[in-house]
Amino acid sequence: MNKKFKYKKSLLAAILSATLLAGCDGGGSGSSSDTPPVDSGTGSLPEVKPDPTPNPEPTPEPTPDPEPTPEPIPDPEPTPEPEPEPVPTKTGYLTLGGSQRVTGATCNGESSDGFTFKPGEDVTCVAGNTTIATFNTQSEAARSLRAVEKVSFSLEDAQELAGSDDKKSNAVSLVTSSNSCPANTEQVCLTFSSVIESKRFDSLYKQIDLAPEEFKKLVNEEVENNAATDKAPSTHTSPVVPVTTPGTKPDLNASFVSANAEQFYQYQPTEIILSEGRLVDSQGYGVAGVNYYTNSGRGVTGENGEFSFSWGEAISFGIDTFELGSVRGNKSTIALTELGDEVRGANIDQLIHRYSTTGQNNTRVVPDDVRKVFAEYPNVINEIINLSLSNGATLGEGEQVVNLPNEFIEQFNTGQAKEIDTAICAKTDGCNEARWFSLTTRNVNDGQIQGVINKLWGVDTNYKSVSKFHVFHDSTNFYGSTGNARGQAVVNISNAAFPILMARNDKNYWLAFGEKRAWDKNELAYITEAPSIVRPENVTRETASFNLPFISLGQVGDGKLMVIGNPHYNSILRCPNGYSWNGGVNKDGQCTLNSDPDDMKNFMENVLRYLSNDRWLPDAKSSMTVGTNLETVYFKKHGQVLGNSAPFAFHKDFTGITVKPMTSYGNLNPDEVPLLILNGFEYVTQWGSDPYSIPLRADTSKPKLTQQDVTDLIAYMNKGGSVLIMENVMSNLKEESASGFVRLLDAAGLSMALNKSVVNNDPQGYPDRVRQRRSTPIWVYERYPAVDGKPPYTIDDTTKEVIWKYQQENKPDDKPKLEVASWQEEVEGKQVTQFAFIDEADHKTPESLAAAKQRILDAFPGLEVCKDSDYHYEVNCLEYRPGTDVPVTGGMYVPQYTQLDLSADTAKAMLQAADLGTNIQRLYQHELYFRTNGRQGERLNSVDLERLYQNMSVWLWNETKYRYEEGKEDELGFKTFTEFLNCYTNNAYVGTQCSAELKKSLIDNKMIYGEESSKAGMMNPSYPLNYMEKPLTRLMLGRSWWDLNIKVDVEKYPGVVNTNGETVTQNINLYSAPTKWFAGNMQSTGLWAPAQQEVSIESKSTVPVTVTVALADDLTGREKHEVSLNRPPRVTKTYDLKANDKVTFKVPYGGLIYIKGDSKEVQSADFTFTGVVKAPFYKDGKWQHDLNSPAPLGELESASFVYTTPKKNLNASNYTGGLEQFANDLDTFASSMNDFYGRDSEDGKHRMFTYKNLPGHKHRFANDVQISIGDAHSGYPVMNSSFSPNSTTLPTTPLNDWLIWHEVGHNAAETPLTVPGATEVANNVLALYMQDRYLGKMNRVADDITVAPEYLEESNGQAWARGGAGDRLLMYAQLKEWAEKNFDIKKWYPDGTPLPEFYSEREGMKGWNLFQLMHRKARGDEVSNDKFGGKNYCAESNGNAADTLMLCASWVAQTDLSEFFKKWNPGANAYQLPGASEMSFEGGVSQSAYNTLASLDLPKPEQGPETINQVTEHKMSAE
């Protein structure tokens, strides 16, 4: 019972991360297995601080003359004392499964979705008034985890749940069922809208030690049926929790990063920012009439598609209980196509197009008739209309073109989808035809992202060429050396954004494509000396890997936001050929240096051209105004200094650009100012004595953009404006002052919260660093140290191949490390280590250089100068290595700047979305990463993962026979693609074979079974399966439904059959005349089609039939299931069997066989099944097939129900009367349902759903391991997620089971009870009837009804709208209890008129007579109409269901119940605009209905139903 009516909005704590600063890396260990100092987001960033040794004097750099704003010459650098590092504070997140965040609870007094803790202290999490989880965090104090700032705590790992799988299962079940934001797939909200909800949660959490099935029933009745209404299209919540590999961290700095870590960097609002949005179709027209739901409000999209929301929250869209999809509210225009992945999004757009009418200005309007039809199929509508089916994509490039079927459109030609489609089209004057035949003409290599990169890099010849990209270094000063390369990470966290530039981080990262590698694939040097035949391979894009981006681009509406992670790039605009080192401008504004190449000028010209949408063109007579909030640019120079400064301006080479200083951005017109160059923060210009402080980084305590500025900038970009930000944000961005900046980036799908540089220096360093380069050429002798007096390798005399000892002995820990050779030499009486290293810069004459070389040769007798002049990384000889021409600085030999090679190949390699072969390989490497706990493979950014996974699903989820043809262009990478397919299909595809190397890897990593297994050649489905961790397995599992060459291990689901098939003939009823769709005539055969075995069915019927194998929901694309699949997502197969014909088929996984005819005449026919095995089948009171029949599932068929369940359940050990009693109870329930709805005839208006003389028409109830929506859902069959193959008990008790009453009640619910908002209520009235009839009282409402009158008084005439489903149920309960003493059914049946038997005079049941007569009257019953005015107010409708309910109840009761209905106002809807403190209301009973009721002049009750505060209790005797 809700005593508080305002929805609470929990403020979410910011979740953006902090990481340690990168230090300097002057030297190196000389290890060949050293990774570059910057990682790709999959490993921790080491913190390297200089040794506290005496600080040599810096080498002063020449100062240009004149210098207009000279910086003071820095003092000699301080020698920092080593300090004990404090244990860093970290940010924790309470999660389910490590990835689904829990909000609304508190941990250590802060929000559970981002709380601070210190490693070593306990974390205690509370929901309601209950401690639900305690965690020990001592392990987080490990030094190896210092760089990891974000930590997820899984509820399942709580100390309270340790050692009990039942407790874990029950705790998760309760939390997911209590979710108050079911539309948000990333979070679970434990925000209770009333004290009662909170107490209910507390009470249930204390009972988590119950058996799971018992607890599930308790939760289903107590929680799910009190669901907060109007929070999502469907309030059915799924108990599925993401499955994640133990040890993953949601921090991109971790060594083992979780698959969805990027979500933890999204903007989380700390304040309510009221926003207006628009829902549009793919043509940009507004979509009106769609329900939307957020945590802060709800409503229906307006005439132009407008809706209100609070920035950053999840927004869900739907029509009645039909779920269209949900998005984060971080933009103001949301397209239907964005509500799902590419395929689903196109289907949503097509569905709305089909069922909408055209409004003003070409808007799409969803009429109320669509909602009404959908309402007849509550929840199951999501299963009937499948939005994830393929939609006729055309795939390919050049000659390689594949056309896929349009399953989405085809589904409306058969079954219940056809019935719904026909009904809607009849009510809306015909539906719209498909807008185009192929909804998505898509090409995996469509190149949109690649095209943008090619433009900006100048690969596109219409743009300026950029071959070397300049990366500035930090302005720190250790030992006279400048800081490390600084490209601050700008991560794309949604598919609205993509990277523009990522630096390489593979082992040969500093070598350009086409150069010879320094390291081989095992990170060993190439042994090229005689007699070895080993030759170094070239660096190629196939072996390249990349760090996270430091330049990224995001789309916001029609505009763009580009972010570059360093402020020095602004100086290139001022002096495009004088920026790299010690640049500046003189007093006349002229650049003091002009020696830098054109590459970066060209890059900036490309950026300005692209961001302005070609409004500005270089070298052309074009002009553009650029707005900015920058006043000054600073040039990079030596020392810990800001650098030379100059006013922000454009060099004259950027012709035609005018700068407009700006401080506000409201109503800015992109036509007038197409581009803004902004900073989010002031610069850090003071740093005291901190030698690690980096000048010019963003001072996040001093924002330059307010939240209003950000709102205005987003509006500006939506209209087509572009924003360029060049800034070094070294912060985890948790500060309140940074929230506007974070929101701005988030709107474009970007985040800078990673707080790390992602560019490696060139490998310069101390002389002992292997593989290094200097500005000038060097000479170096690199070698592997001897082991036991011998090299760590041998060269085979015969094959000339190099054999490494550690590999031969399988001792990976003994892998040798390359070193720069050294020797000891006495200097002034001391032994000093001398390295075999020469920098030519130290030798001014040829004679000096020759002497230095000879000194090394003399130190190592037999050493020679290397002979291969084309390869500069030879070992075991004195090697010449050319210089880079980039000056190095100071005693740590750090280059002044770093250069990245750009080329067409680099562009393709960076994006790595070029072809199918690359894509499938990348997904495989991503899966290896998780299967090996990060030791192998490479993790994909979650945005890239989604993009590649969706692309590949389009290619793989069909039955196309792909092939590779030698000698033809292979633009799409079919060679690699088909090789992978062949590994899963035992070489069924033409042109390639599964290579031994790939096959071994797949077997070793448990993706397919090897020859030693009894399942050799099968794929391992790896349940529970999370596509974000194992995308290749998920893709192949999806394909296995079409491609029977992929054989899936079915041991876990549905179960293995080890019996040979047999031939069986059965006579099957084909008559079809259902009263309602949910009691249909699909016939069970009790036969099983084994997986991958040929089955044939021969028909002697004179009518065609449909054959169905397996009854299971399609889980494809259902986000909550895709992260924890326990079975193949698609299982059901259907086949058409013509009259007197035969059909032969194989099914992928096995399943029970069903036959459905459509004969309008009573008839049956023989069918002969070949290759089938028997399943346990109890029918007509006996076993037709024994319980020990081979199939894993069995069925019970009673007179009214067919019940499907794992066969052991059919032992029915929980039923004293066994299956006979269970069957009788099912039939009793079916008969009682007929009674409740007043159905007692075999034809006409009051025809029963099921009855003896309607053979073959029955309700269906099936148990499955995973279902599409909720714990259970309505439909034909009703689906239930209770699936316990090892249990001997039946999970259902038909005469005491809220779940079956609730779901079957959904199917049967009908007018006049089905008012708006009653979807999860009207069905439960049947359940109350069952409780009264078989348990003696309405237990479900017995407690809540005691305070119902007070609740009505406090609700101010809006009790319905303010309440949840449980509260609304009280309205019907009060009406029934009032009728118990105030309604006499006999008044309606005068003497001589027989009283139908379903009416009852029993105490506690008499009140139901009112409902039964209301149902009959709504169907047009005529008894005594003439006696009571002649007009049937239950059968007539003005279109308002709430009016009908009030008039019907009052007329049948012959009592004016207006006061009761005024207090409840059923059918009303509450909505709350973001920021509003009070709810608003709409709908409900109309004034005209009250006027009509008043005109009937019915007596008012002495005590109306609104006064009822208790239920009638009847002491039960056997009925």
Swiss-Prot record:
Q: Cellular component terms, GO, for this chain's entry?
A: plasma membrane
Q: Does the keyword Zinc apply?
A: no
Q: What Pfam families would the database entry show?
A: DUF4092, M60-like_N, Peptidase_M60
Q: Which domain of life is it from?
A: Bacteria
Task: State the UniProt keywords alphabetically.
Answer: Cell membrane, Lipoprotein, Membrane, Palmitate, Signal
Compositional bias, Low complexity, is annotated for 31-42, 234-247
Region listing for Disordered, in residue ranges: 22-107, 226-247, 1497-1519
SMART domains assigned: M60-like
The family note in this entry says: To V.cholerae AcfD (VC_0845).
Anything else known: Encoded in a type II secretion system (T2SS-beta); this strain encodes 2 T2SS but only this one (beta) is expressed under standard laboratory conditions.
Q: Supply the PANTHER family for this chain.
A: EXPERIMENTAL AUTOIMMUNE PROSTATITIS ANTIGEN 2-RELATED (PTHR15730), SI:CH211-210B2.2-RELATED (PTHR15730:SF5)
What job does the chain carry out? May be a substrate of the type II secretion system beta (T2SS-beta).
Record's protein name? Putative lipoprotein YghJ
**Source organism (scientific name):** Escherichia coli O78:H11 (strain H10407 / ETEC)
- Per UniProt, what is the name of the gene that codes for the protein in this document? yghJ
